[in-house]
From Swiss-Prot:
NCBIfam families: DPOR_bchN, PRK02842.1. Its cofactor is [4Fe-4S] cluster. It comes from Nostoc sp. (strain PCC 7120 / SAG 25.82 / UTEX 2576). This is Light-independent protochlorophyllide reductase subunit N. [4Fe-4S] cluster binds at C23, C48, C108. GO terms for molecular function: 4 iron, 4 sulfur cluster binding; ATP binding; metal ion binding; oxidoreductase activity, acting on iron-sulfur proteins as donors; oxidoreductase activity, acting on the CH-CH group of donors, iron-sulfur protein as acceptor. It catalyses: chlorophyllide a + oxidized 2[4Fe-4S]-[ferredoxin] + 2 ADP + 2 phosphate = protochlorophyllide a + reduced 2[4Fe-4S]-[ferredoxin] + 2 ATP + 2 H2O. The keyword Magnesium does not apply. Its EC number is 1.3.7.7.
Length: 467
């Protein structure tokens, strides 16, 4: 158990550590599944290919909708024509897969050799007749989740700027509504349309699994709010319309570049809300959207209380315990806020990069949660130095460390409970109903160790026998 100290304001520090994270080209792993009519072409070296092959775990026989354009010595020494080579590959992709969009993912090497992908794409797009989106998701980013941010920022430029007039185009674009209205009579659909409050169009951005998209869309529908579209959509042809003055809201804390693009280039209005992670975050996210549209939220108190009651069997395992975030995927602030609400003390939040404007509502909510729960506010460390962090872990002795994969086993060998931060990226953690999945991940190492203690296995490392 930890002794609660006087709550204090958030303390921000910045160290000069290296970034310990996956390469952002790993965003291909979930984006190619999300955008069903896409093809991702990663332009890089053999190293990028090995990483993708290991990270994805997809056999070549499965014919996945991504490929590796491997740069050779001829490319780097400018003996080969970049345009001719990329044209050959894209024509082959068109012939074999015929996607609605080809996404070129630039890497460190294309940056270093100054390959002008943005200049090549429009000309080639005109020749092959397929849109080509260029995203520089290279290893020069702070966190691997920013690969998605780069791709969505590039996709935002391709969203139509006028609502469709033709009926056929309307049907093609309203995919979310068609999914929700599947199998219903026209009269029922018309009746449900009348339930929505009159408000400006709202577009949500962030790549989430389809069940979570449906859940969040329905939660807003209960408040009379209609979601005009999602970025990214299931299909490239269904990208949402973005006219000047449209409202946009993010669902992930690592999408600051996309938010900036939507505001500056597409002249949209950003709703600065906390993110819908955990019951408290989901409630605050819905409340903020309602307040912007002048709607009084209904039934959120009961909904949140009901979810917390269902989480009690997990919450009692971590209440009073301490957690330390080493920093990996930019979800740290949202997870820290949720765990404080669960009764944990967050000792430190390491984060590779902090956009204080985009995460302002989340930071304010974390500070408020610490005050209301009577626990000290965590130290916020941007770009943490791992050597210093390990020393602080030895001093603070947290009950759990949430860390990148590289440090998990060394810390476990020293008797420190760890959880891989990458698992929170791939798990369904958004919305009211998925809060249980977050606690399932957080409590797993603690439950495992309790089970091992019951068996009499207290130590991971075998001690030397004394003869």
């Amino acid at each position: 158990m930890t002794i609660a100290q006087e709550p204090t304001a958030l303390n921000f520090e910045c160290e000069t550590g290296n970034y310990h994270t996956f390469c952002p080209i790993s965003c291909v792993a979930w984006l190619y599944q999300k955008i069903e009519d896409s093809f991702f072409l990663v332009i890089g070296t053999k190293t990028c290919g090995y990483f993708l092959q290991n990270a994805m775990g997809v056999m070549i026989f499965a014919e996945p909708r991504y490929a590796m354009a491997e740069l050779e010595e001829g490319d780097i020494s400018a003996q080969l024509n970049d345009y001719a080579e990329l044209k050959r590959l894209c024509e082959q992709i068109k012939r074999d897969r015929n996607p609605s969009v080809i996404v070129w993912i630039g890497t460190c090497t294309t940056e270093i050799i100054k390959m002008d992908l943005e200049g090549l794409a429009p000309k080639l797009e005109g020749e092959i007749g397929i849109p080509i989106v260029v995203a520089r998701a290279n290893g020069l980013d702070y966190a691997f989740t920013q690969g998605e941010d780069t791709v969505l920022a590039a996709m935002a430029h391709r969203c139509p700027d006028k609502a469709p007039v033709a009926e056929a185009e309307k049907n093609e674009r309203n995919a979310v509504q068609k999914l929700l209205n599947f199998g219903k009579k026209k009269e029922l659909v018309a009746q449900e349309e009348s339930e929505y409050v009159d408000h400006p169009p709202l577009v949500l951005f962030g790549s989430l699994p389809d069940p979570v998209v449906t859940q969040l869309t329905l939660e807003l529908k209960k408040q009379g709010i209609k979601v005009s579209g999602w970025l990214p959509a299931k299909r490239f042809t269904e990208l949402p319309v973005l006219e000047e003055g449209y409202y946009v809201a993010g669902v992930n804390p690592f999408l600051s570049r996309t938010a900036t693009t939507l505001m500056r280039r597409r002249k949209c209005k950003l709703i600065g809300a906390p993110f819908p992670i955990g019951p408290d975050g989901t409630r605050a996210w819905i409340e903020k959207i309602c307040s912007v549209f002048g709607i009084t939220p209904k039934g959120l108190d009961e909904r949140e209380a009901q979810i917390w009651a269902g989480l009690e069997d997990y919450v009692k395992l971590i209440r009073g315990k301490s957690v330390f975030f080493m920093g990996d995927n930019l979800l740290e602030v949202s997870l820290a806020r949720f765990l404080v609400r669960c009764g944990m003390t967050v000792q430190e939040v390491g984060i590779p990069y902090m956009d204080k404007r985009y995460q302002a509502a989340e930071l304010a909510m974390l500070e408020k949660a610490c005050q209301e729960m009577g626990v000290p506010s965590p130290k916020m460390v941007e770009k943490p130095d791992n050597y210093n962090q390990v020393q602080r872990i030895y001093d603070l002795k947290p009950d759990l460390v949430i860390t990148g994969m590289a440090h998990a086993n060394p810390l476990e060998a020293r008797g420190i409970n760890t959880k891989w931060s990458v698992e929170f990226t791939f798990a369904q953690i958004h919305g009211f109903t998925n809060a249980r999945d977050i606690l399932e991940l957080v409590t797993r190492p603690l439950r495992r160790n309790n089970n091992l203690k019951d068996l009499g296995w207290d130590k991971l490392v075998r001690e030397e026998a004394k003869i």
